[in-house]
Swiss-Prot record:
Gene that produces this protein: recG
Listed SUPFAM superfamilies: Nucleic acid-binding proteins, P-loop containing nucleoside triphosphate hydrolases
UniProt GO MF annotations: ATP binding; ATP hydrolysis activity; DNA binding; DNA helicase activity
Disruption phenotype: Greatly decreased growth rate with many dead clumped cells in rich media, higher sensitivity to UV light, no change in the spontaneous mutation rate, no change in the rates of slippage in tetranucleotide repeat tracts (i.e. phase variation).
Listed name of the protein: ATP-dependent DNA helicase RecG
High-level lineage: Bacteria, Pseudomonadati, Pseudomonadota, Gammaproteobacteria, Pasteurellales
Pfam families hit by this protein: DEAD, Helicase_C, RecG_dom3_C, RecG_wedge
Domain Helicase ATP-binding span(s) in chain numbering: 283-448
Function according to Swiss-Prot or TrEMBL: Plays a critical role in recombination and DNA repair. Helps process Holliday junction intermediates to mature products by catalyzing branch migration. Has replication fork regression activity, unwinds stalled or blocked replication forks to make a HJ that can be resolved. Has a DNA unwinding activity characteristic of a DNA helicase with 3'-5' polarity. Involved in genome maintenance but probably not in phase variation, which contributes to virulence and disease.
Domain Helicase C-terminal residue range list: 482-628
SMART domains documented for this protein: DEXDc, HELICc
Gene3D superfamilies: Nucleic acid-binding proteins, P-loop containing nucleotide triphosphate hydrolases
Species of the source: Haemophilus influenzae (strain ATCC 51907 / DSM 11121 / KW20 / Rd)
Binding partners and assembly: Monomer.
Membrane spanning stretches: none
Keyword Signal: no
Length: 693
């Protein structure tokens, strides 16, 4: 039997595993023997040696032995059993908050005890609370572990000891089988066999470097981390290659439409925009679907890039669909494209949840017959009732939360007569390069790394909420004297939407009393979409001076006259989200300000994070720092398809390995396609997300 087949060996083949234990193991993702072997320890304890009490250090785990000096029960609100031991070098106190008479009687003065636990500082001597212990009888030798003791992530009702016993059985089975090494030597830079790596990591020898293990730096760990990242990358490459097996209509400009459109604009595209448009045009002339991600910082001009991509399809007599995450943003896009495209007789339709009844039916008919060449909307565009006449390009805006699976579904939606639409995905949330190389390995990536001229930098200040009165006066000055508009953003992270709405309403009431001369609007997540839309449009049309809002405005309308933003409890938000919010101002040519208001005292980490935002306007620098501080799951806003399942690797810790992995993956999938399939099966277990590719 080879390890490739171990995923077919049921857990019930192990002694002691019945239905109840199987169900508990399933809760932690263990369904077969291979899962069990890949369920590696999260840390280790050294129970292989006795440490003298005099040499103990607080906040670390040790095995000690000593003779009982005293055994006392302190009766208070809850009784505590305290046992002092001495080994001749010093003393230590063992404390038990849950105990019975049998335990108390076993600690007779003069008895020898072996104990293991975390050492804490005590008033008179070090202490261990609730240690694991053993009474050593009649000078019997003390039995110590031969390897480091693994600690696994587990679930209720599944003890560490049970997991260790099951792993011991799996390792014993591993010794009996011939394991075919899937990875060719030239693709294994760490030179550990899989068998050696698994054995060492489940049962490390006592002389191993614990520090290396804790940091994920041991060659045995690196071997598995490398292979897992390689498998994920191969799976994404497979999606990419799979896409190239599909047919798409090559789109060349048929007329001078692009030149005529550019001539109507009051500005010139930046060099970065021209470069990205060129990337897109090179993709669109191919006979397989484009899958391109365009990253551009807030205000970098992604909409113009989308317009030029759309015109290529429209010039070929085809349809374009643009999907935005909110109705507000979708309507803004629809209005922009109508304004830009009207001189050329191009019809732009829009479809969202609020378009109902006869209007909806009329819009659906236009889409079906091709009367509209471009359709803008929310995810409503991809409901079953929507039929496109001849869809050749799908543009997804602000959808970095889309996983591979959704991208594949969109491809299927636009299929017609064996041809599939090209896809352009745009995000204003800069994704750290290492993350993009992993999460978006199935996409080609372009970056708009230049802001249009005339954009003024935003001055960011970090202020304690104790200075709230000053800030309110600053808002008054901006709105009354400078005739500008302002945002006041309330945040209640990890609270319910109800509480967040109540907090926003309370702040709106306070500001309405403090600033009676201003027209103040309110937007929060509990409002109906139409109510939110109406308030946002009033703000856009300058009927409101100040908008009190929750983070629903992170992706929102373009209001060039808004030049001041106050963000309450800024320390509670991630850096990338703060950067997105800040991007709502600084859209005109007036100097703009963002005030990050925090609740004191501010911890060191929060201080450091807010300083990053104060000192940098570069979304890519900010996203790298955000990744360091919060990790990949948080930065992406959701556990990404294909990333959430990492068992051994850690994207933050192991990010330096990713470029090497990507290099190996490209070579391996060409030279050894069968090996690539085996690796994907081993680590991803043929997950559904890749089966359509």
């Amino acid at each position: 039997m080879s390890l490739e087949l171990l995923d077919a060996v049921p857990l019930t083949s192990l002694s002691g595993v019945g239905a109840a234990i199987s169900n508990k193991l399933a809760k932690i993702g263990i369904h077969n023997l291979q899962d069990l072997l890949f369920h590696l320890p999260i840390r280790y304890e050294d129970r292989t040696r006795i440490t003298l009490i005099a040499n103990l250090r607080p906040e670390q785990y040790f095995t000690i032995e000593g003779i009982v000096q005293t055994c006392e029960v302190a009766f208070g609100r809850r009784p505590i059993l305290s046992v002092s031991l001495s080994d001749g070098t010093s003393k230590i106190m063992l404390r038990f908050f849950n105990f019975n008479a049998g335990m108390r009687n076993s600690f007779q003065v003069g008895v020898r005890v072996k104990a293991f636990g975390e050492v804490k500082r005590g008033r008179h001597m070090p202490e261990i609370h609730h240690p694991e212990y053993q009474i050593v009888r009649d000078n019997a030798p003390i039995v110590l572990e031969e390897t480091l003791t693994p600690i696994y992530s587990t679930t209720e009702g599944l003890k560490q000891n049970s997991l260790r016993k099951l792993t011991d059985q799996a390792l014993a089975l591993l010794d009996k089988v011939q394991i075919a090494e899937i990875l060719p030597n030239e693709f294994n830079p760490h030179q550990y066999s899989l068998k050696e790596a698994l054995r060492l990591l489940h049962r490390p020898p006592p002389d191993i470097s614990l520090e290396m293990l804790e940091q994920g730096k041991h060659p045995a760990q690196q071997r598995l981390i490398f292979e897992e990242l390689l498998a994920h990358n191969l799976a994404m490459q497979k999606v990419r290659l799979g896409t190239q097996q599909f047919s798409a209509l090559p789109l060349h400009y048929q007329t001078d439409l692009k030149q005529r459109f550019l001539a109507t604009l009051p500005f010139q595209p930046t060099n970065a925009q021209k470069r990205v448009v060129s990337d897109i045009e090179q993709d669109l002339i191919k006979d397989y679907p484009m899958m391109r991600l365009v990253q551009g910082d807030v205000g970098s001009g992604k909409t113009l890039v989308a317009a030029l991509a759309a015109l290529t399809a429209i010039d070929n007599g085809k349809q374009v669909a643009l999907m935005a995450p909110t109705e507000i943003l979708a309507e803004q896009h629809a209005n922009n494209f109508r304004r830009w495209f009207k001189p050329f007789g191009i019809e732009v339709g829009w479809l969202a949840g609020k378009v109902k009844g006869k209007s909806r039916q009329a819009e659906l008919e236009k889409i079906k017959t091709g009367a509209v060449q471009m359709v803008v909307g929310t995810h409503a565009l991809f409901q079953e009732e929507v039929e496109f006449s001849d869809l050749a390009l799908v543009i997804i805006d602000e959808q970095h939360r889309f996983g591979v699976h959704q991208r594949l579904m969109l491809r299927e939606k636009g299929e017609k007569a064996g041809f599939y639409p090209h896809q352009l995905i745009m995000t204003a949330t800069p994704i750290p390069r290492t993350l993009a190389m992993t999460v978006y390995a199935d996409l080609d990536t372009s970056i708009i790394d230049e802001l249009p001229p005339g954009r003024t930098p935003i001055t960011t200040v970090v202020v304690s909420e104790e200075r709230r009165a000053e800030i309110v006066m600053r808002v008054k000055n901006a709105c009354v004297n400078e005739k500008r508009q302002a945002y006041w953003v309330c945040t209640l992270i990890d609270e319910s939407e109800v509480l967040e709405a109540q907090a926003a309403e309370a702040i709106w009431e306070d500001l309405t009393k403090a600033l009676p001369m201003l027209n103040i609007g309110l937007v929060h997540g509990r409002m109906k979409p139409q109510e939110k839309q109406d308030v946002m449009m009033r703000f856009k049309n300058a009927e409101l001076d100040l908008l009190v809002a929750t983070t629903v405005i992170e992706v929102g309308v373009d209001v060039p006259n808004a030049s001041l933003m106050i963000i309450e409890n800024a320390e509670r938000l991630g850096l990338s989200q703060l950067h997105q919010l800040r991007g709502r101002v600084g859209r005109g040519c007036t100097a703009s300000f963002c005030v990050l208001m925090y609740k004191p005292p501010l911890g060191k980490v929060s201080q450091k994070r807010l300083q990053v935002l104060r000192d940098s306007q570069d979304g890519f620098v900010i996203s790298e720092k955000d990744l360091e501080i919060r990790g990949p799951g948080e930065v992406l806003g959701t556990k990404q398809t294909g990333i959430a399942e990492l068992r051994v690797a850690n994207l933050m810790r192991d990010r330096k390995m990713i470029p090497t992995v990507q290099h190996y993956a490209k070579s391996l999938i060409q030279k050894y396609p069968d090996v690539a399939e085996s690796l994907i099966r081993r680590w991803l277990n043929n997950k559904e997300i890749y089966s359509n590719a």
